[in-house]
Curated annotation (Swiss-Prot):
The keyword Hydrolase is annotated on this UniProt entry: no
Gene: thrS
Record GO cellular component, one term: cytosol
Catalytic as annotated region, ranges: 244-535
Name of the protein: Threonine--tRNA ligase
Length: 642
């Protein structure tokens, strides 16, 4: 009979197979009431599943913000299915998984759902959840599951069974009163746990993500353990909507996208100014950290991509073209090109480390449904670098990369950075000795800099361990940007060698390094982080000179010209409009400084300075203001005096 070991080491003996809920009941009614599911020997199970042998058990409760919340959200997806089938009996249910901060359900319904319909569906979900009905799990044979869904006309569930479930498996069917769904689970024991949810929006999604399949309707929702957490999340979503880079990009005339070039960015003058400033900043860092900048071809013969191994792994994501009976691929990444540059001319150990960087224009054929403004595109620019070094140089080079990452991120104001180290997978290339040495070098580099990190066992690429840097923005959203990836494979495949101290030919270790990742995506992140209020050094327009009447027009024009000659992005607004109108317009455009020229300022050779947040900085002599703004730009100061 089972002996159950709890997390505190205590044991409970039972005469018969016992469920997680029954164990909780044996401890106390309060725990039983809060029990959502269990974790038996590390595997999640439903609260009703019987434990037949000795096992360790963790009880998942409403206090669990990871597994407990994920289970509640998954059960809310089933609740959504229950409500949908009551309101739209002809709807065919596809899949309803959890995602970050929520869940969705894909449905096949002839009627296009509106926001009004969404409110009706949510109201029905509330009615159902209030009854706190029991969720009943039944393990059935494959055939019984298929017969169940065939009788209900659920063709998508039948397809999942046919293609993804073994015939000898026993699928779990979850009964929500008259509604039945299929899932691996676990799920909540009753709907009393699903009281704090919100349906968010509707989008289109191809079945199985394949554009050759039917377009389904995807309903997104979110759920939390309590009302306070739900409301806080909804408030963050409202703020995120205000900061949406697509909306602000249009408002500030930064860029646009159009149907004739899906996933490709049309940079306008203002947006391109931001892009170029980022390039200048990264180039400054490249010089500081000893990189040489190179430029590889946009397109290379298929033969090279086959030799590198990318053709086998990335062919579907590569754009191709043919000419003179040769097939070419537009590069999805820069690394094979950088090895071609390294291979030109004999290299000695004295030439290493060799740090090669490129603002590489890359293209990947991302699914149309995944494209999102400039955050997820098909054409993008990588601030990519590859370091060729010896095994003994790994740690010093990794340390330098990490310093560069932190130097860069702190310049933009990102302080909350989560670091993950991925170690060797089961299937890999390279000796255990080089893996030992490399993993230890990464660990030592992080420890030497007092950087906390999480080890992801077995999550490294087959060709080397990796460090990932994830930024958390002002809305606590995670953005994985920087990587430091060791590679023992590609230099071998593409014939990269150097002459060692003993005159032997050796293969260099290659370190892939990205700081921003994609410049397009990083600009999108910055737009939303700053809500369009770029720091002065990045702002497309750094100052605007406005006159009060036509009398000061020439003076305002002269002021703007002098600012421009001093390298400041400035212009004069000499329109015959009221001063209040002009100030409001440029405030909405997030111009850092507005320089007002009236009669007094013109006579004294001064300007009246105010910030975009409405702060009056008083009057400045023009040269004094130029010195002030130049110092702010040169220091890449984050915040204005506002």
């Amino acid at each position: 009979m089972p002996i159950i070991t709890l997390p505190d080491g205590s044991q409970r003996h039972f005469d018969n197979p016992v469920s997680t809920l029954e164990v909780a009941q044996s401890i106390g009614p309060g725990l039983a009431k809060a029990t959502i599911a269990g974790r038996v020997n590390g595997a999640r199970v439903d609260a009703c599943d019987l434990i037949e042998h000795d096992a360790s058990l963790e009880i998942i409760t409403t206090k669990d913000e990871v597994d407990g919340l994920e289970i509640v959200r998954h059960s809310c997806a089933h609740l959504l299915g229950h409500a949908l089938k009551q309101l739209y009996p002809n709807a065919k249910m596809a899949i309803g998984p959890t995602i970050d901060s929520g869940f969705y359900y894909d449905i096949d319904l002839e009627q296009s759902l509106s926001q009004e319909d969404l409110e009706k569906i949510e109201a029905r979900m509330v009615e159902l959840a209030k009854t706190k009905y029991a969720v009943v799990k039944k393990k059935v044979s494959w055939q019984e599951a298929r017969d169940t869904f065939e009788s209900r006309g659920e063709s998508y569930k039948m397809e999942i069974l046919d293609e993804n479930v073994a015939r000898d498996d026993r699928p779990g069917l979850y009964h929500h009163e008259e509604y039945i769904d299929m899932c691996r689970g676990p799920h909540v024991p009753h709907m009393g746990f699903c009281q704090n949810f919100k349906l968010l929006n509707i989008a289109g999604a191809y079945w199985r993500g394949n554009s050759d399949n039917k377009m389904l309707q995807r309903i997104y929702g979110t759920a939390f353990h309590d009302k306070k957490a739900l409301q806080a999340h909804l408030t963050r979503l409202e703020e995120a909507a205000k900061r949406d880079h697509r909306k602000i990009g249009k408002q500030l005339d930064l860029f646009h996208m159009q149907q004739e070039a899906p996933g490709m960015v049309f940079w306008h003058h203002n947006g391109w100014s931001v892009f170029r400033e980022l390039e200048i900043f990264i180039r400054h860092k490249l010089n500081e950290y000893g990189y040489q900048e190179v430029k590889g071809p946009l397109m290379m013969d298929r033969v090279l991509w086959e030799r590198s191994g990318h053709w086998d792994k990335y062919a579907d994501a590569m754009f191709t073209t043919s000419s003179e009976n040769r097939e070419y691929a537009i590069k999805p990444m820069n690394c094979p090109g950088h090895i071609q540059i390294f291979n030109q001319g004999l290299k000695s150990y004295r030439d290493l480390p060799l740090r090669m960087a490129e603002f590489g224009s890359c293209h990947r054929n991302e699914p149309s449904g995944s494209l999102h403004g400039i955050m997820r595109v098909r054409g993008f620019t990588q601030d990519d670098a590859h370091i060729f070094c010896t095994e003994d140089q790994i740690q010093q080079e990794v340390t330098s990369c990490i310093k560069m990452v932190y130097d860069t991120y702190t310049t933009f104001g990102f302080q909350n950075i989560v670091v993950k180290l991925s170690t060797r997978p089961e299937k890999r290339v390279g000796s255990d000795e080089i893996w030992d040495k490399s993993e230890q070098a990464l660990i030592d580099s992080l420890k030497a800099m007092d950087i906390p990190f999480e080890i992801q066992e077995g999550e490294g690429a087959f060709y080397g361990p990796k460090i990932e840097f994830t930024l958390y923005d002002c809305l606590d959203r995670a953005w994985q940007c920087g990587t430091v990836q060791l590679d023992f494979n590609l230099p071998t495949r593409l014939g990269a060698t150097y002459v060692g101290e003993s005159n032997e030919r050796l293969i260099p270790v290659m370190i892939h390094r990205a700081i921003l990742g994609s410049l397009e995506r990083f600009i999108g992140i910055l737009i939303e982080e700053y809500a369009g209020f770029f720091p002065t050094w990045l702002a497309p327009e750094q100052a605007v000179v406005v006159n009060i009447t036509d009398k000061q027009a020439d003076y305002a024009h002269e002021v703007a010209q002098k600012l421009q000659k001093c390298g400041i992005r400035a212009k004069a607004d000499l329109r015959n409009e009221k001063i209040g109108f002009k100030i409001r317009e440029h405030t909405l455009k997030r111009v850092p400084y507005m320089l007002v020229c009236g009669d007094q300022e013109m006579e004294a050779g001064e300007i009246a300075v105010r910030t975009r947040k409405g702060k009056d900085l008083g009057k400045f002599k023009l040269d004094d203001f130029i010195a002030h703004i130049q110092a702010e730009i040169a220091s890449r100061k984050l915040n204005l005096e506002e």
